[in-house]
Amino acid sequence: KRNGCISPEESQKHQPYQCFERDRCNALWQTDFKGDFLLGDSSRCFPLDILDDRSRFCIRTEPKPAASGIKETFLNAFREYGLPDSVLSDNGSQFSGFRGGYTQFERWLMDLDILPIHGRIRHPQTQGKIERFHRTMKLELLRTVPNDMEDARVKFALWRWKYNHIRPHAALGMKPPAQVYEPSSRALFVPKPYDYGSGMVRKVNNWGYLRFGPVRVYLSETM
């Protein structure tokens, strides 16, 4: 390390894992797509899951025909349970922007005063709770394959209710998550539009680049 042969990034990979847990409900939600699988009608299912970090309460587990449409799922969750302080996800293209820029989803979260957080690349332990949730889902729910997307929605909804209200959790003193979770006191609201002053107008293309003559500068896809 003294000779510059070991990078800080490489050193960080080998640090001992540190468990974390927020001290109250809705301080952090974890979200991720469960790996897709084949349904009985040969279509593919991409379950999107949202988990409260403190209580392990499953906010949403929603089977989808594609790894997209996350804003609608979160919007329904915000309407039912209120707003979290932050949302932790991996660096998948649905959640994380290109070259450090922001996605439309991240911009929307920030407009709602929600901090988007991303785990370290190739370090799934950061989202250990939702990874463990996915293992439980695979063991208890996906032992039998749903017939189609509608059948998947029914089975996922039933299993989610059992997981939240009946299934005891060791980290909660053998209580089910529903006995610990409380909805957020922050209700969903409509963000105020930005009011920009007068000045030079420059167009940002669909890929987030701003052009000055022959020079291209990357800003963000949300501009």
Residues of each region from the PLM?
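Basic, flexible linker segments flanking DNA-binding modules
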Residues: 1-31, 36, 103, 176-185
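RNase H-like DDE/DDD metal-dependent nuclease/strand-transfer catalytic core used by mobile genetic elements
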Residues: 5-6, 23-47, 53-151
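Residue-level recognition of single "structural anchor" positions
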Residues: 16-24, 33, 65, 86, ...
